[in-house]
Structure formats: structure tokens, C-alpha cells
Regions:
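Structural signature of tandem-repeat unit edges
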Residues: 1-13, 23-36, 46-59, 68-80, ...
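Consensus positions within tandem repeat domains that build extended binding/scaffold surfaces
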Residues: 15-20, 38-41, 61-64, 83-85, ...
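Extracellular/lumenal glycan-associated surfaces
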Residues: 20, 135-140, 256-261
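Short, T/G/N/S-enriched strand-turn elements that build extracellular solenoid repeat scaffolds
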Residues: 51, 62-63, 84, 135-139, ...
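A structural signal for leucine-rich repeat
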Residues: 87, 160-164, 183
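Acidic glycine-/aspartate-rich tracts in secreted/extracellular proteins
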Residues: 152-153, 173-177, 184, 262-266, ...
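A short, polar beta-strand/turn micro-motif
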Residues: 192-217, 247-311, 315-354
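C-terminal outer-membrane/trafficking sorting elements
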Residues: 231-234, 354-362
Length: 362
């Protein structure tokens, strides 16, 4: 059975249904010239868990990855995506739709049935650049508890786009009334705040949108800490230290955060009205399980960089925050990624004068 394929470096198009029903195909290696992935090209490829869209890919055909095994999808703003591209990807757990940088970039809509039947997808953030959500876009996403909308004005919404989902839609507090005034959106469960109950004194949080922690119902806002920008990953297998933690009441998108509060207390937070730009230099560098690391140095050892998709995981061992698994290059070779996984950790400096945190509870 076909498990791995290395396509020619000069290949520009993967034809319609080229690898359809290749049920054992797990790895696809292609060059930097590929522009088009045809209709149904990887349909029914259940073993294909990961597929990284390189910068050259501009067109993704209808049903391109329908019923594939993808678990994580990072899209690009300059892509045109056909209908039902990821339909029935039942293992899909994370989707990144980037904000487009200008009006000429075509990723401004969620196409018809694009994620329909993705039953494991728990949340998604739609950037302000999304102006249309088409029919059945998320129909049947039974686990979709959080749909985060960053646009100030309601997008054009097909009435069945969120059928057979929890229909929980979160918007900016200042824009809630605008969404309530739109009949299509008002038929959903519109909300402007989230709640988080802490089971231990310290916890972690990951969001791919700016977050503001607010006082509500007589409770103070929980305390959040982010790492200083001096932290840098140089060797993925080495333990690094966060030398200083900064206390904040808002966090920028894609930042790992440590929360402090009272156990068994419910705290409130919401989408920030403006990006938390003041925190741009307070980056910590943990990663989500499906994140790819990119090697930038010819020595094959140092200066790995991360895609903007991070996640902290607390361990039972006090004062250690494990970052989960990160997929790295085995060789510093163009077009090669994701071959090996490693675990690495961050340690908190336990000096209260610099961190404000004495211990971390699992």
C-alpha cells in the first residue's frame, strides 16, 4: 500500500482525484512550485494526518481533503478554496484562518460545506477579513462549542451554516447589538463574554484572538502572566527558563498565558476590543501538538522558529510547564518538515521578586 509519496520539485498541479482512496497514504512531500491541488485530490485518505500548505499553494479544489485524516489545518490568506474542501474530516481539531492583508487576497469567505461534518472541531476563530459564511459551512460540527467572530460588522450568513452545532457565537462586547440586529445572526446563541472556572491556583489558556480579562458579578478579574521576550528557543531538546513574568489584564493573540486565581472560582473574560499590542514583546514560546517548527540555520541545530500557534500544558511536577510535542525537521533541507517529534519544557524562575509565582499546581 502507498504510505509515502515524494512529488517532483517542479510540479505545479496535483490533478483531480489524484490520490483519492489512497487509504494508507500518510506523508506527502512536495516542492515549492506547487500551485493547485485539484478537486478530490486527497479525498478519503484516512491515514493522512498532516498536510502543510506551503507558500506556493494558491488553489484548493472542491472536496480536496474530504474524509481525510487531517487533525490540524493552517490556511493562507491568498488561497482560493472550493466547496466541501475539508468536509467529514472527523479527526480535525484545529483550524487557523489568517486575517488577509489586503482586498486582493481571496480568502474572505468560508466556502459551502467547507467544514461540514468535522465532528471533533471544538472551536474556530473567524478573522475580520471573513465577509461571507456560505451554506452548510459548519453543518454537523457537533463539538463546535466556541465560534469566535472578530469582525465589527456581521458577515453575510447562510441560514444553515451552523445547523447541527451548539451555535455558540462569541463577538466583541461593543458589537453584540449589531449582531443581534441581524436576523440571521440573532437566530444563533450570541454571547459577548466567556467564563473559566479554575480548578487549581494556576492554569493555562490559549486563544488565537486578543483576550481581555474583566471583573463581573462581583468578582475581580483573574491575574494573567506572560513571559518576557528575552526567552528564546535555541535547542528544542534543552530546558529553557522564563526569566521574568509580566502581570497583565489583556493578552495578544497566540500567546501562552499562565493564569492565577482562586480554585473553584469562575472568572470572566472577553474578546479584546483592540489588539493587545503593548504585549507584543512579551512572547513565550510553547507550542501546540500540531505545530511545525521551521529550521533557519545551516548548521542544522540552532534557531528554530515557530508557527504562530502555541499551547502550554501544566505537568504534575511543580514549577514545570511542558509544551507538548513539536514537529521538527530532521534535516535542514528545503521542503522537508514534520519528520520527528520532540518534547521540551519551560521552567519558571521561582523567585517571587521576578515571577510573582511560587509554584505551579498540576
Amino acid at each position: 500500500a502507498l504510505t509515502t509519496i515524494k512529488l517532483p520539485a517542479e510540479l505545479k498541479t496535483i490533478d483531480t482525484q489524484a490520490f483519492r482512496t489512497c487509504t494508507s497514504l500518510a506523508t506527502v512531500d512536495y516542492g515549492t512550485k506547487l500551485e493547485t491541488i485539484g478537486d478530490g485530490a486527497f479525498m478519503s485518505t484516512g491515514a493522512l494526518k498532516k498536510f502543510f500548505f506551503k507558500g506556493s499553494v494558491k488553489t484548493l479544489g472542491a472536496n480536496a481533503f474530504q474524509e481525510s485524516g487531517l487533525t490540524c489545518v493552517h490556511l493562507k490568506g491568498d488561497m482560493t478554496i472550493g466547496k466541501e474542501a475539508f468536509m467529514m474530516c472527523t479527526g480535525l481539531k484545529y483550524v487557523e484562518i489568517p486575517a488577509t492583508s489586503n482586498a486582493s487576497q481571496p480568502l474572505n469567505n468560508v466556502s459551502e460545506g467547507m467544514f461540514a461534518g468535522c465532528t471533533s472541531l471544538p472551536f474556530i476563530t473567524l478573522p475580520a477579513s471573513i465577509t461571507t459564511i456560505k451554506a452548510n459551512a459548519f453543518n454537523g460540527c457537533a463539538a463546535l462549542e466556541y465560534v469566535n467572530i472578530l469582525a465589527d460588522s456581521p458577515a453575510t450568513l447562510a441560514t444553515n451554516a451552523f445547523d447541527n452545532t451548539p451555535k455558540n457565537i462569541y463577538v466583541k462586547a461593543s458589537k453584540l447589538s449589531a449582531y443581534q440586529a441581524n436576523a440571521a445572526w440573532n437566530a444563533l446563541n450570541l454571547k459577548d463574554t466567556y467564563e473559566r472556572t479554575l480548578t487549581t491556583k494556576y492554569a493555562t489558556m490559549t486563544h488565537d484572538f486578543p483576550v481581555e480579562f474583566v471583573a463581573a458579578n462581583g468578582r475581580e478579574a483573574m491575574v494573567a502572566y506572560v513571559g518576557k521576550s528575552t526567552y528564546k528557543v535555541t535547542q528544542p531538546t534543552k530546558v529553557q527558563k522564563i526569566l521574568k513574568m509580566t502581570k497583565v489584564n489583556a493578552i495578544a493573540a497566540n500567546e501562552g498565558v499562565i493564569l492565577a486565581g482562586t480554585p473553584n472560582t469562575t472568572y470572566t473574560y472577553r474578546i479584546a476590543e483592540t489588539a493587545a499590542t503593548k504585549l507584543a514583546d512579551n512572547k513565550v514560546m510553547p507550542v501546540r501538538e500540531d505545530t511545525l517548527l521551521y529550521q533557519t540555520e545551516a548548521d542544522g541545530k540552532s534557531n528554530w522558529t515557530l508557527q504562530p500557534d502555541y499551547k502550554l500544558h501544566l505537568s504534575e511536577n511543580a514549577k514545570t510547564i511542558y509544551c507538548g510535542r513539536a514537529y521538527i525537521h530532521e534535516q535542514n533541507e528545503a521542503g522537508v518538515q514534520g519528520a520527528k517529534s520532540v518534547s521540551f519544557a519551560l521552567e519558571l524562575d521561582d523567585n517571587p521578586a521576578t515571577t510573582g509565582i511560587n509554584t505551579v499546581e498540576g
